[in-house]
């Protein structure tokens, strides 16, 4: 009967599972060695430093150390959230993080799809190579380019004045309203080509017969993209979106620090700059640590919520 058949099949499965032998361990010794190295690296550089989080709950004094500094509970967190500057920094970080996420995410997908539509292999490789190059430029170089382009005598002002869009040049870095779009543009220009790599890989894994079937049904390029390409890369899009949601508070440090000035600091400062200012420059390590813990906890919560949302809607999940 059915129960007897299931019992026999389970017994067969158990019989086919061979225990890990010393011979198997020796055969995989290189893999096991590097796995052990990475585990040790993770423990030393990712888990042991978490002991420093105790500073956020202390009136930390470097001369006393973590073990002997006075325990103050959540006092540093209360000070943090009563600081108007920190609340403004949270607003800036969230705003720039969301804008950067949407802008870089969408442009990378669109760029990968458009690149896939180029039929000339030589042309496609040339465009790919050119689009990857900005990723390898440091933010110091990128901000230098932006300063030259957006200065009063820069090419952007010259073009806008010559086209009579502006009556006179403007100082983009003196108006807070321009700062967030400038940061978003810089991130898109720098990372679009690099971020498109994984989408191009996902597109190449789509079965070519699906495109052939769509062509037989009379589908043009747009319909092939809509009904074949986008559904084919949807799992990749969802997974990367879930991973990037947790990085919303990683809105950046270098570009904001290098482009920011006293005129726009109310819109340019992020949590990382706040931590640098209070935690390192002014030596208040407890406040800096508390701000870092807040940032980490919010990132974890965002990832969990995004993952649960994807699970509820039947999409791909991280865990």
Regions of interest found by a model, annotated:
Residues 1-24:
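Short, Lys/Arg-rich, polar N-terminal cytosolic tail immediately upstream
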Residues 24-319:
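A structural signal for multi-pass alpha-helical bundles of membrane permease subunits
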């Amino acid at each position: 009967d059915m129960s007897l058949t299931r019992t026999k099949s389970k017994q067969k499965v158990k019989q086919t599972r061979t225990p890990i032998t010393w011979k198997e361990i020796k055969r995989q010794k290189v893999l096991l060695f590097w796995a052990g190295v990475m585990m040790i690296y993770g423990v030393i550089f990712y888990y042991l430093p978490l002991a420093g989080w105790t500073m956020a709950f202390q009136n930390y004094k470097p001369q006393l150390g973590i073990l002997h500094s006075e325990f103050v509970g959540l006092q540093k967190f209360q000070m943090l959230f009563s600081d108007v500057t920190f609340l403004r920094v949270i607003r800036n970080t969230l705003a720039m993080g969301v804008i950067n996420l949407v802008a870089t995410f969408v442009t990378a997908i669109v760029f990968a799809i458009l690149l896939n539509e180029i039929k000339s292999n030589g042309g496609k490789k040339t465009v790919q190579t050119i689009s990857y190059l900005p990723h390898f430029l440091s933010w110091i170089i990128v901000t230098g380019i932006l300063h030259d382009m957006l200065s009063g005598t820069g090419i952007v002002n010259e073009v806008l004045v010559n086209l009579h869009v502006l009556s006179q040049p403007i100082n983009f870095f003196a108006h807070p309203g321009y700062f967030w779009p400038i940061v978003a543009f810089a991130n898109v220009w720098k990372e679009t080509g690099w971020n498109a790599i994984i989408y191009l890989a996902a597109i190449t894994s789509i079965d070519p017969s699906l495109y052939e079937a769509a062509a037989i049904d009379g589908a043009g390029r747009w319909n092939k993209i809509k009904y074949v390409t986008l559904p084919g890369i949807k799992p990749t899009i969802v997974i990367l979106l879930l991973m990037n949601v947790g990085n919303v508070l990683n809105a950046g440090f270098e570009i904001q620090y290098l482009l920011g000035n006293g005129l726009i600091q109310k819109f340019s400062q992020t949590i990382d700059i706040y931590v640098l200012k209070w935690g390192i420059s002014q030596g208040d390590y407890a406040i800096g640590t508390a701000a870092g813990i807040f940032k980490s906890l919010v990132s974890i919560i965002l990832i969990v919520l995004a993952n649960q949302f994807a699970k509820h809607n039947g999409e791909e999940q991280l865990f």
